[in-house]
Amino acid sequence: MSPQTETKASVGFKAGVKEYKLTYYTPEYQTKDTDILAAFRVTPQPGVPPEEAGAAVAAESSTGTWTTVWTDGLTSLDRYKGRCYRIERVVGEKDQYIAYVAYPLDLFEEGSVTNMFTSIVGNVFGFKALRALRLEDLRIPPAYVKTFQGPPHGIQVERDKLNKYGRPLLGCTIKPKLGLSAKNYGRAVYECLRGGLDFTKDDENVNSQPFMRWRDRFLFCAEALFKAQTETGEIKGHYLNATAGTCEEMIKRAVFARELGVPIVMHDYLTGGFTANTTLAHYCRDNGLLLHIHRAMHAVIDRQKNHGIHFRVLAKALRMSGGDHIHSGTVVGKLEGERDITLGFVDLLRDDFVEQDRSRGIYFTQDWVSLPGVLPVASGGIHVWHMPALTEIFGDDSVLQFGGGTLGHPWGNAPGAVANRVALEACVKARNEGRDLAREGNEIIREACKWSPELAAACEVWKEIVFNFAAVDVLDK
């Protein structure tokens, strides 16, 4: 026997490969209040038992690797390993299972969404034993929530800053999204804000291109919003997109926005990354700036039902990383979004405590403790005829954002803004009087048209515009 063999035998180390389920499938495990809990939709390869697939997810996203290693003996795997503690078959789907995994809190760096995602979804999605894998939900324990700053300000502070209460906020994305000069861009901002909108917005891919450098855009937009504020007596904002190629450049743009005295900046949090987003959120908290978040690239990650990460997880991650607004779909517009699923993650964005509710896709009860809420932003293919439904679906604590539905008005940008403001005020008034927006919505809009020619013109233009496509991501039966 060689010295090497003698050494291995003497420490009881047995090399080789063993099934994951022998170590990481623990149906007897009782979850702890401090565990991060995950619900994965697992589609195993043919011949792979669901218990082995669920255990493989737990192993590869925590302490495991493909073979036994001698350094396992230098730590306590029982303390640090992830555990697949329950598996459910998905009704109506062949070979799909929900695998529940518990992770000890010590596996994660405090205050770092980047580290949390690197661990839980960083490597396991390419695992050959799985045909497909989707992270459906996470339960973030209060002990971990308290390590995050979260949104720079939150819903109530934003309302106080803007002095706007009792209704949804109104916004507009400036179109065309690319190609305008900074001066023409600022002109559109001014006209929309003067017409009655609360916000205008840079589109997600407006950064600092040759046709419009960021500093020029910031200057003209600031001039526009201050002029609109003076004329209307209302506080206005424009989401100045600070997203950039480096964190240093991003912060430089946010600093310039603060020096101009504007109330809000913007970030593309998925393409920009969670580290950049958290950095910007901390700057905004320290310097009194609101932070609007765009979810560009989300559908690459969340749209397919059997693979990726559900948006409710990305929404939770954003609330932890930091943002005062985030785009959340519309239910009624041009973009993907089933009603019950959308309302489920809207509640996860806004509320302090959300109960488990599988009918809305919420797998775990979530307690946000004292983390501020985030305003959901309904944007994408919406117009004045959608206003009753949007007001009823999203309620007061939301931003309703009409891009083409403002700038596409036949009389111009300011009349388009007037039409949207009149429609919103009519819907809020009707709701407060006890009328049913879902049933009487069209009638409410027609009544308002009688005293608003701008709204009447908008209603005529968009009276036949609908987006009747079934959602791809729907609830399980």
UniProtKB/Swiss-Prot annotation:
InterPro entries listed in its UniProt record: RuBisCO, RuBisCo_large_chain_AS, RuBisCO_lsu_C, RuBisCO_lsu_C_sf, RuBisCO_lsu_fd_N, RuBisCO_lsu_N_sf, RuBisCO_lsuI
Binding site for Mg(2+): K201, D203, E204
Post-translational modification: The disulfide bond which can form in the large chain dimeric partners within the hexadecamer appears to be associated with oxidative stress and protein turnover.
GO molecular function: magnesium ion binding; monooxygenase activity; ribulose-bisphosphate carboxylase activity
Localization terms from the record: Plastid, Chloroplast
Binding annotation for substrate: N123, T173, K177, R295, H327, S379
Entry's cofactor comment: Binds 1 Mg(2+) ion per subunit.
Active site feature: K175 (proton acceptor), H294 (proton acceptor)
Modification type N-acetylproline: residues: P3
Coiled coil residues, start to end: none
Residue numbers bearing the N6-carboxylysine modification: K201
Site positions per UniProt: Transition state stabilizer: K334
Catalytic activity: 2 (2R)-3-phosphoglycerate + 2 H(+) = D-ribulose 1,5-bisphosphate + CO2 + H2O; D-ribulose 1,5-bisphosphate + O2 = 2-phosphoglycolate + (2R)-3-phosphoglycerate + 2 H(+)
Chain residues in the propeptide: 1-2
GO cellular component, one term: chloroplast
Residues annotated with N6,N6,N6-trimethyllysine modification: K14
Alphabetized UniProt keyword annotations: Acetylation, Calvin cycle, Carbon dioxide fixation, Chloroplast, Disulfide bond, Lyase, Magnesium, Metal-binding, Methylation, Monooxygenase, Oxidoreductase, Photorespiration, Photosynthesis, Plastid
Further remarks about this protein from its record: The basic functional RuBisCO is composed of a large chain homodimer in a 'head-to-tail' conformation. In form I RuBisCO this homodimer is arranged in a barrel-like tetramer with the small subunits forming a tetrameric 'cap' on each end of the 'barrel'.
Subunit and interaction comment: Heterohexadecamer of 8 large chains and 8 small chains; disulfide-linked. The disulfide link is formed within the large subunit homodimers.
Protein name: Ribulose bisphosphate carboxylase large chain
Gene: rbcL
